[in-house]
Amino acid sequence: MENQLLVRRLGRQDYTPVWQAMHQFTDQRDSTTRDEVWLVEHNPVFTQGQAGKAEHLLNTGDIPVVQSDRGGQVTYHGPGQLVAYFLIDLRRKKLGVRELVTHIENLVIHTLKHYQIESAARPDAPGVYVQNRKICSLGLRIRKGCSFHGLALNIQMDLAPFLRINPCGYAGMEMIQLSDLHPVSMEQVEKVLIQELVTLLDYEQVEFSTEAYNHE
């Protein structure tokens, strides 16, 4: 199972049911469970991470706010943003948390390079940035030596809701999206992202599914 990966393409989903399913998957997995990556677009939602503060919610309006258990502070998810959840057995992969964060940042940097876009991580604020504007947010949780939660990469979306918050706790943090820099589709980016992940984390066997995780 160490080198096997299942990628679930879940389409457009509300945040809370997917979050609950990640918990169930992580609670029930054991040393024989293969790693999974879930690709999803969420309906509009603000999520507060464990370090989130109420004062960073400026004017949420009609968009719901969900208190999440991932690391980090507040962010926005919405249609046109690629969310990838990494359900990885870190002990089996012999990875530390910081190593996984670096791998995920590099995964996005390599994916953007595929489109001739130069980007970088920042030591003071996890995520990936293009010319100091944030294109990808990152937040993880580790339980039983396994990761869940993941990244949110802005592809082709309405960025206006980010103005209603201090993204990741930074007032005035400017956001950017891939379609501002290069014409691209969600499907193309998914494909490149998974190829880069397989290379970075050394998976040898990859299977794709459009079925949601069912814990029963």
From Swiss-Prot:
The keyword Acyltransferase applies. Keywords: Acyltransferase, Cytoplasm, Transferase. The active site is at C168 (acyl-thioester intermediate). Residues 31-205 form the BPL/LPL catalytic domain. One of its GO terms (biological process) is protein modification process. InterPro entries: aa-tRNA-synth_II/BPL/LPL, BPL_LPL_catalytic, Octanoyltransferase, Octanoyltransferase_CS. The record marks K134 as: Lowers pKa of active site Cys. Its EC number is 2.3.1.181. It comes from the Bacteria. Gene3D superfamilies: Bira Bifunctional Protein, Domain 2. GO terms for cellular component: cytoplasm. One of its GO terms (molecular function) is lipoyl(octanoyl) transferase activity. It is found in: Cytoplasm. Pathway: Protein modification; protein lipoylation via endogenous pathway; protein N(6)-(lipoyl)lysine from octanoyl-[acyl-carrier-protein]: step 1/2. It is an enzyme of class 2 (transferase). It catalyses: octanoyl-[ACP] + L-lysyl-[protein] = N(6)-octanoyl-L-lysyl-[protein] + holo-[ACP] + H(+). Substrate binds at R70, G71, G72, Q73, V74, T75, Y76, H77, S137, L138, G139, G150, L151, A152. Its main location: cytoplasm. Pfam families: LplA-B_cat. The keyword Cytoplasm applies. Catalyzes the transfer of endogenously produced octanoic acid from octanoyl-acyl-carrier-protein onto the lipoyl domains of lipoate-dependent enzymes. Lipoyl-ACP can also act as a substrate although octanoyl-ACP is likely to be the physiological substrate. Belongs to the LipB family. In the reaction, the free carboxyl group of octanoic acid is attached via an amide linkage to the epsilon-amino group of a specific lysine residue of lipoyl domains of lipoate-dependent enzymes. This is Octanoyltransferase. It comes from Vibrio cholerae serotype O1 (strain ATCC 39541 / Classical Ogawa 395 / O395).
